[in-house]
Amino acid sequence: MIIHPKVRGFICTTTHPLGCERNVLDQIAATRARGVRNDGPKKVLVIGASSGYGLASRITAAFGFGADTLGVFFEKPGSDKKAGTAGWYNSAAFDTHAKAAGLYSKSINGDAFSDEARAKVIELIKTDMGGQVDLVVYSLASPVRKLPSTGEVKRSALKPIGNTYTATAIDTNKDTIIQASIEPATEQEIEDTITVMGGQDWELWIDALDSAGVLAKGARSVAFSYIGTEITWPIYWHGALGKAKVDLDHTAQRLDARLQASGGGANVAVLKSVVTQASAAIPVMPLYISMVYKIMKEKGLHEGTIEQLDRLFRERLYREDGQPAEVDEQNRLRLDDWELRDDVQDACKALWPQVTTENLFALTDYAGYKHEFLKLFGFERKDVDYDADVDPDVKFDCIELG
């Protein structure tokens, strides 16, 4: 079929299999260009492995360190009539090219919040991966979580706390500057957001893996977070999501103490703002990212997901000098350090009040934002003919859970 982009709200409802594959190949090439090291992780589990930072960590582990990888995600496969999700095509491409490079790659498609997923992962590690993993990457970003204990469904809320938040934002459908107002979260919404996006599920994963004896001596775990800046704090760090991320920090401290007993450790890695399906859903983020991308590109500081993960692995988790990673006062790995530089943030604060519908494209990198957003779904690549026929029914070595 011939597939063109169709955007609705902050979601692109179509995806291009070949474009997604080429995106993955770009990330593999960027990783290989930095050389392969053999002093890092050997067996890696990535929970939330199909897009954004999770996919980038899987690519970095495999193609930067030669690791065997097991990826868990929840995606829709394509059929001969309908395209699947971008994450499905990303994972198919990863699997194909990892196997072609002689690397072990296995994938599980199902609800990563479920006990069934944990049981399947443990079984695979025992029967297929030599019995133990030495790195667990936790990278789930989901608006809903079904609690394994009760079957109850909880939803997260992208809302401020206390007061209605009003700020300049972009209506990404109309490319206009608007005033967006968001009502504050209720106590229940805050609690539910912590349940969905906090550290509870990460801890359940480590509990299950540890009890089953599939964590190697010295195993590490890392979960991803975002703190952002004063500009985004009301909706993010000081909002319901921020409360969930604080819970993630507390969880990391508990897990770190536990894994340190066998020479390992756990950390939250705070990453920079990037264009992902997750960030596109957060009001104010498209405008902030459009500004910060322009400023960081001008300063030669720009990084995408793969550059961030490369730096996390090579300069933090697995330093060549064997030294422990530099952490902040909360024991977090900070990869948002360049974005938070005073010169970058001062430029953002100065630019923010000047942006109007008329000068949006001139003052910010909104054109770059739109391009990156469509690229997430496999579009806007110069090396893909979007008027050519493409088969949406892509199959690969993937275990489907109920």
UniProtKB/Swiss-Prot annotation:
Family from the record: Belongs to the TER reductase family.
UniProt-annotated binding residues for substrate: Y226
Entry keyword Oxidoreductase: yes
Active site as annotated: Y236
Site (Plays an important role in discriminating NADH against NADPH): E75
Pfam families the record matches: Eno-Rase_FAD_bd, Eno-Rase_NADH_b, Enoyl_reductase
Keyword vocabulary terms for this entry: Fatty acid biosynthesis, Fatty acid metabolism, Lipid biosynthesis, Lipid metabolism, NAD, Oxidoreductase
InterPro entries registered for this protein in UniProt: Eno_Rdtase_FAD-bd_dom, Enoyl-CoA_Rdtase_cat_dom, FabV-like_NADH_b, Trans-2-enoyl-CoA_reductase
Organism: Xanthomonas campestris pv. campestris (strain ATCC 33913 / DSM 3586 / NCPPB 528 / LMG 568 / P 25)
Primary role: Involved in the final reduction of the elongation cycle of fatty acid synthesis (FAS II). Catalyzes the reduction of a carbon-carbon double bond in an enoyl moiety that is covalently linked to an acyl carrier protein (ACP).
Designated gene of the protein: fabV
Protein name according to UniProt: Enoyl-[acyl-carrier-protein] reductase [NADH]
Assembly, per entry: Monomer.
Binding-site residues, NAD(+): 48-53, 74-75, 111-112, 140-141, 245, 274-276
